[in-house]
Amino acid sequence: MIVTNNRVYAKYNNQDLVNDAISRFPKEARDFNLFLADYQSFGDYLNYGNNKEILFNFKELKFDNEGMPKVKYGEGYYYNPVTLAQYSLAVYGEYLKGENTKENFLKIADKLLTLQDSRGGFLYNFQWRYYLNNYDYKPGWVSGMAQGQALSVLARAYKITGNKKYLEAGNKALNFLITPISKGGVMANLGSLSSSLKNNIIFEEYISDVPTYTLNGFMFSLLGLYDWANVDDSNKKNTAEKYFNEGIKSLTQILKYYDIGGFTCYDLGYITKNREKPHIAVNYHGVHIYLLNALYSITNDRVLYDYYKLWKAYVDTTEVDRISGVNRYETNANISKEFTKEGINTIILASGENYADALSAVPLASKNQCPILLGESNSINSFTINEIKRLNPNKIIVIGGEGAISQKVCNDIKKTNKSIVFERIGGKDRYETSYLISSKIDSKEAFLVYGNNYADTLSIATISAIKGIPILLTQEKYIPNPIKNYIDENTQIDKYYIIGGNGVISEKIESQIENTERIGGKDRYETNTKVLNRFIDELDLSKVYMAIGGPSNMDYADALSCVPLAAISKSPILLVPTTRQIPKSVTDFAYDNLQNNTNIIAIGGKAILPNYKINSIIPEK
């Protein structure tokens, strides 16, 4: 089957719309977890057999004298091909459990056949209006969903009877499903989304003058194709498999459009018909989740799994372990409280307003087995001063010059404890400060990192702390003089790790240093995971911290604060952006290396790092 590598991101975002849907979801949606199952063509369809009473609202159904369900539309009750198909699949599931329902299943399947016309289409013989149209469908309308669900019924009916009528009906149903709308069928293309997608197919649940691309109906039709591809006696099985694969390819291309940043929409009418906002049918978010799970179990396609996990996490109410505060300084102080419950000899005080000097201090904090507290340039906030009082250190190492942490701040701290000794490590710029700090670290290895962005430094910070490796800051195209001096003075260094791609540290720099190894990705998040994979043997993956890694220049503080704490347990820090997108490199690392019992701890508040981001990367399979 097809595996793709699309990235997960929200095409549309309206937080009020999302919040309303999430608040309604527990009351309006079925428990989608009941329908989560690895899919088998001749097995219990989506666990319907175990959940018939939950699947159907029997108050809206009326059963005829033969026990066939009818649904009310307008003033009358009618046979709906989808309702008949789903009810028969539930009865089939009961049969698989050992109940005496085989004949009832076949009776419903036969009733379904009475709705099939000579072309192979299953007809809705009642008038109905789709909310996006300004006209009614006349009796005899068709849909891709009905075709797909009928194929799932007919595949099972033929499997347990060998009766050719089901085989013939299924082949006709398949032919109708893959017939273009322009020729009277239900197959469309995705050209209304993008000209680049005009060759991608989709099976429309509701035929309209402008395609609307209803998601659940499309996925149900794909299950039908998969089922028919597994009917050995069908001369159409290869055709079914071909269109299933093409449909999966389309699905992976368009899932991003249904993600509105915290919930899913029902269709894409908000794009194709230029509607003001997406249409949300709250219960169908759960349907999307269990259909994606079923299709992933068939294809092993990572894109499907990524969206399954993400959409499931959107409505996961499970709280996650979290260390946070009202701002970066309280978060920093709370992390320090986790670092040690008692007093401590030394602490490091670095700028909470500028990342350069603070990040260079990571291996020094590890050497002194102490936390890094964050301060402001000309004042000391209450969270930091109270934590200093609690820790009652003998010594404070101030990182950076007076532009980073002023003498006034030191004097204010001194007022709380006159016995505190201050040591300042600060050069005329970030490169000299990096040199001065690194000169205090004994190591045979060093990290060389771009000095004008914190992202790559955050990626190696935990490894730097665990292994005691100094962090040297450099320019993109030349090595600053203080760092040149370090390289010349420290001949014991036998390996320099260059962090980041050629766009941040040039090949020219690499050529000037012996014994280098470059670790870099296409962005900061891939670099982060490549670093973690490179040093995976140094890490204990039973606990993982997750923090924001950008894109703002101020998004470094929580991850930096966490480094000394993470180093104690040799835990990695996974970086994610503040945007809703979860980079593929992050999910790949999580799914490949973490377990479903891994303790993932969020660093920072829910506003910047919501629960769903953590829950979405916890592996299930």
What is each PLM-predicted segment?
Residues 2-12:
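Sec-dependent signal peptide cleavage junction
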Residues 11-19, 93-107, 157-172, 226-246, ...:
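Structural helix-adjacent loops and short alpha-helical linkers that scaffold large soluble proteins
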Residues 13-74, 102-123, 167-198, 240-264, ...:
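Long, well-ordered core segments of solenoidal/helical folds
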Residues 69-73, 128-138, 195-211, 266-275:
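Acidic/His metal-coordination segments adjacent to aromatic residues that form catalytic metal sites
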Residues 80-95, 141-158, 212-229, 279-297:
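Well-ordered alpha-helical segments within folded domains of soluble proteins
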Residues 120-177:
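Hydrophobic alpha-helical segments and helix pairs
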Residues 229-232, 236-286, 290-306, 310-317:
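Long, repeat-rich segments with strong aromatic
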Residues 318-621:
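Extracellular glycan-binding segments that recognize GlcNAc-based cell-wall polysaccharides
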